[in-house]
Amino acid sequence: MGKKVIVLGEIRDGELRNVTFEAIAAGRTISGDGEVIGVLIGENVQSIAQELIHYGADKVLTAEDPKLKTYTADGYSQVMRGVIEQENPDSVIFGHTAMGKDLSPKLAARLQTGLISDAIDVSVTGGNVVFTRPIYSGKAFERVISTDPMIFATIRPNNIQASEKDTSRSGSIESIDVSLTDLRTVIQEVVKKTADGVDLSEAKIIVAGGRGVKSKEGFQPLQELAEVLGAAVGASRGACDADYCDYALQIGQTGKVVTPDLYIACGISGAIQHLAGMSNSKVIVAINKDPEADIFKIADYGIVGDLFEVVPLLTEEFKQLNIHS
């Protein structure tokens, strides 16, 4: 017997984030031959609802209101609670993002159910939904089965393969009547602190710098390499603490957890707190002058050398590859 799964979509700058498609794929695994329902909340979201169906949703529910244009826990939780009570799903899936990490525990607590967070894989064994999640800073993995009648879970970006887009798929798109009451938070303005670029949490390639960059200006070669690769720029806490870059770029135990296809660590020693945020990257390249640096212990490829010499060489080489391709 199939299961009913609700997936909350995430929208940024009018477009669906990749983690939404990955969450839909997880929902399809859980549902079997059941129903996957996508939920889109915001302003003018009807226009992108069909894309969820193309990636595997059977039905999409849209909630539109000017007050929902920017995420607030009050507004989104009211909408989601109404949807959950109406649909009575077996599972509710979120991305393990800033929004998902804020909203999912609030809803789970209000609905008196458990939450499985930061899952990197979903499977079904013997009729049970099994979530795999990292523990001990990624040194081990646990497989979790929930005994609650309704499962809440968050999915780490870049770990579950999204389904191929199928424009031949069809499904229903329905609007939800929105009646927001007692909103304690109203967003008046959003000021972006960092420049527009590739989103760090969903980036396929990341170029990260540590204390070895030595200054704010030291990040310039990394930014040039990132631009050539179409990558995001990240940093260790040491670089952030030294005021070489903004804390929005921090990767690690107290920063963002990332799992890109390629992670290039430049001048990063490899403190355990940093490794906790990037050790599950598919391919790790380390550049460091110290041959004994801990980062080399987990690197797939290591370059012992001065990053200010190595990184420009890599940048030039990739430029040539781009030209010839």
From Swiss-Prot:
Presence of keyword Flavoprotein: yes
Bilayer-spanning residue ranges: none
Keywords from the UniProt entry: Electron transport, FAD, Flavoprotein, Transport
SMART domains: ETF
Cofactor descriptive note: Binds 1 FAD per dimer.
Binding site for FAD: 262-290
CDD domains for the chain: ETF_alpha
Superkingdom of origin: Bacteria
Pfam family, one: ETF_alpha
Cofactor annotation: FAD
Family matches, as InterPro entries: DHS-like_NAD/FAD-binding_dom, ETF_a/b_N, ETF_a/FixB, ETF_alpha_N, ETF_asu_C, ETF_asu_C_CS, Rossmann-like_a/b/a_fold
GO biological process, one term: fatty acid beta-oxidation using acyl-CoA dehydrogenase
One function term, GO molecular function aspect: flavin adenine dinucleotide binding
Similarity annotation: Belongs to the ETF alpha-subunit/FixB family.
Subunit structure: Heterodimer of an alpha and a beta subunit.
Protein task: The electron transfer flavoprotein serves as a specific electron acceptor for other dehydrogenases. It transfers the electrons to the main respiratory chain via ETF-ubiquinone oxidoreductase (ETF dehydrogenase).
Protein name, as recorded: Electron transfer flavoprotein subunit alpha
